């Protein structure tokens, strides 16, 4: 009797629906129309799927052999407007491009618990865009773009008004910004490799209580920027080979109550620029081979800069501020 009761309380498992030549459905669109919540749609890499998809129910959309979904340079390629969706193992390419509208390979809006994993994004204006979403994961994806015109170049991973996002172990290159967060809180960005972006490898604005750790940022034209935020933790990242007249390993602008610890700033024009930082804890960083190792400017107050290694910089540290209660102690020069 107890066994029967347990069976009755278990949720029903979804079906598996195959898409491809000789399968149950020839197109993903038709499979989505037939699918019920929590079904798994398996897309086989037997052709290029020139489709535009709207996912409005909780499903798993999984590719076998990295099938290509091609938007033919029209609109968003895939739109997600449901919770509990998994996008797995697809190549998503050729969204529309516009200087007026932000098109994307994968557009997720007003959703929670969406997972994007093991996908390849190519030649999209924005690759992955989240709006008003939470509890989402972007992991193990490869993202790049061939767009070179600034007016239509978008970001690889773009999050706006989101909470509790996990962005990890992605390889990103050749976008405007690699990872862009605006009004994004309580999120983790870790173990990503971002290089060759036309602006910032990582760009935070108005985003609080976030952690980014063990990321590798190189050859990004403006470096990395964390701006107008508080309670941000930056641990064990590498910022290297970000060079130019307005390029920094890490640019801090109006940041409060944050920790910068265990990072490496290597061979940048400016390793670390702190402009208007207050109550920052900057410790155990390696700042090596930069033009300026660290610049502390403007109204930066109550910052603790201690036990960092400054090695082989043209200028280890420069400042244009008076004392302002900053503590600089125990560094190696």
Question: PLM features: residue spans?
Answer:
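Extracellular beta-strand-rich solenoid/capping regions of secreted or surface-exposed proteins
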Residues: 37, 48-60, 69-114, 126-133, ...
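Extracellular beta-strand/beta-solenoid scaffold signature
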Residues: 71-79, 99-108, 123-130, 150-160, ...
């Amino acid at each position: 009797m107890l066994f029967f009761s347990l069976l009755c309380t278990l949720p029903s498992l979804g079906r598996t629906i195959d898409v491809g030549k000789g399968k149950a459905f020839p197109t993903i669109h038709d499979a989505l129309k037939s699918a019920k919540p929590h079904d798994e749609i398996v897309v086989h890499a037997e052709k290029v799927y020139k489709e535009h998809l709207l996912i409005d129910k909780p499903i798993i959309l999984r590719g076998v052999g990295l099938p290509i979904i091609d938007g033919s340079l029209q609109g968003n390629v895939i739109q997600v407007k449901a919770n509990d969706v998994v996008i797995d193992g697809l190549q998503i390419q050729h969204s529309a491009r516009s200087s007026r509208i932000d098109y994307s390979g994968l557009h997720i809006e007003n959703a929670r618990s969406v997972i994007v994993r093991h996908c390849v994004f190519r030649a999209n204006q924005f690759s992955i865009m989240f709006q008003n979403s939470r509890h989402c994961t972007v992991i193990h994806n490869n993202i790049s773009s061939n767009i070179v015109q600034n007016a239509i170049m978008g970001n690889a991973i773009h999050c706006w008004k989101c909470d509790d996002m996990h962005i990890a172990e992605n390889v990103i290159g050749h976008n405007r910004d690699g990872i862009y967060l605006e009004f994004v809180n309580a999120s983790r960005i870790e173990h990503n490799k971002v290089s060759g972006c036309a602006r910032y490898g990582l760009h935070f604005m108005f985003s609080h209580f976030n952690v980014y750790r063990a990321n590798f940022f190189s050859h990004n034209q403006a470096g990395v920027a964390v701006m107008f935020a508080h309670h941000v933790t930056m641990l064990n990242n590498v910022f290297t080979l970000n060079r130019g007249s307005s390029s920094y390993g890490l640019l801090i602008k109006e940041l409060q109550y944050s920790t910068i610890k265990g990072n490496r700033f290597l061979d940048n024009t400016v390793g670390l620029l702190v402009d208007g930082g207050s109550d920052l804890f900057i410790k155990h960083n390696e700042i090596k081979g930069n033009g300026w190792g660290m610049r502390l400017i403007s109204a930066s107050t109550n910052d603790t800069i201690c036990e960092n290694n400054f090695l082989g910089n043209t200028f280890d540290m420069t400042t244009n501020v008076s004392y302002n209660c900053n503590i600089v102690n125990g560094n190696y020069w």
